């Protein structure tokens, strides 16, 4: 009986160790439970066969004495428990290195996948930031060019006004001040503007005024010439 208790205690200790190993490796727990179920079922069948054979042998040899049968069974039970303990030890020794060898590989694969995903995400973020920066730079360049063009256009208009005012100040006589539209029109169509002004001057009452002015000027010249001749005759 004490040997049976020792073997059962040893068996329970090994079972506790195996459960702790299972808890440490949840990824391979299902596979090992299948192996353990198969092994336990096979060993149970072996034990049942052995116990049945021993019982039959004991019954055939000593059918009258049940104590001998009990002793035989008691002597056979430690052997079976010892066999189960040895098999559990061998299975544990085979299983623990596989768990130890598989766990670092799984951890490394998880770390590699996480690193690869992180690197891909960083690359995507950097590419998006670069695209946004390029778009902003293009918009800034376009805005600067637009401002430069508007500044040049306004400066040309101002310079044109100054040049026209200088020309007007140099010209002799009084004329109507020309606007910016007139200056641009004369710059674009100078010949047409001159002909239009001439035709305007030679039509209507302007022509009459010009003709009367010319006639009066010729008469005054003739009168001056006549007076000069008369004075010359009187002196002579």
From Swiss-Prot:
This is Protein EVI2A. Residues 1-30 form the signal peptide. Glycans are attached at residues 31, 38, 49, 73, 112. It holds the Pfam family EVI2A. Residues 218-236 have a biased composition (Basic and acidic residues). It is a single-pass type I membrane protein. Belongs to the EVI2A family. It comes from Homo sapiens (Human). InterPro entries: Ectropic_vir_integratn_site_2A. Residues 155-236 are cytoplasmic. GO terms for cellular component: cilium; cytosol; Golgi apparatus; intracellular membrane-bounded organelle; plasma membrane. Residues 217-236 are annotated as: Disordered. The modification Phosphoserine is found at residue 211.
């Amino acid at each position: 009986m004490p040997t049976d208790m020792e073997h059962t205690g040893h068996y329970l200790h090994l079972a506790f160790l195996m459960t702790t190993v299972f808890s440490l490796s949840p990824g391979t727990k299902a596979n090992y439970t299948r192996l353990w179920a198969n092994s336990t079922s096979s060993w149970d069948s072996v034990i049942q066969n052995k116990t049945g054979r021993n019982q039959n042998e004991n019954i055939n040899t000593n059918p009258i004495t049940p104590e001998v049968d009990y002793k035989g069974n008691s002597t056979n039970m430690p052997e079976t428990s010892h066999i189960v303990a040895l098999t559990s030890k061998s299975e544990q020794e085979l299983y623990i290195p596989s768990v130890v060898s598989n766990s670092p590989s799984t951890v490394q694969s998880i770390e590699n996948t996480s690193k690869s995903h992180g690197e891909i995400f960083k690359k995507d973020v950097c590419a998006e930031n670069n695209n946004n920066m390029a778009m902003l730079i293009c918009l800034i360049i376009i805005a600067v060019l637009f401002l430069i063009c508007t500044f040049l256009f306004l400066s040309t208009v101002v310079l044109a006004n100054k040049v026209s005012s200088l020309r007007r100040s140099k010209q002799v006589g009084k004329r109507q001040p020309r606007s910016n539209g007139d200056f641009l029109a004369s710059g674009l169509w100078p010949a047409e503007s001159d002909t239009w002004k001439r035709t305007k001057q030679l039509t209507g009452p302007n022509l009459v005024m010009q003709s009367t002015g010319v006639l009066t000027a010729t008469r005054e010249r003739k009168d001056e010439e006549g007076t000069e001749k008369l004075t010359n005759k009187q002196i002579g």
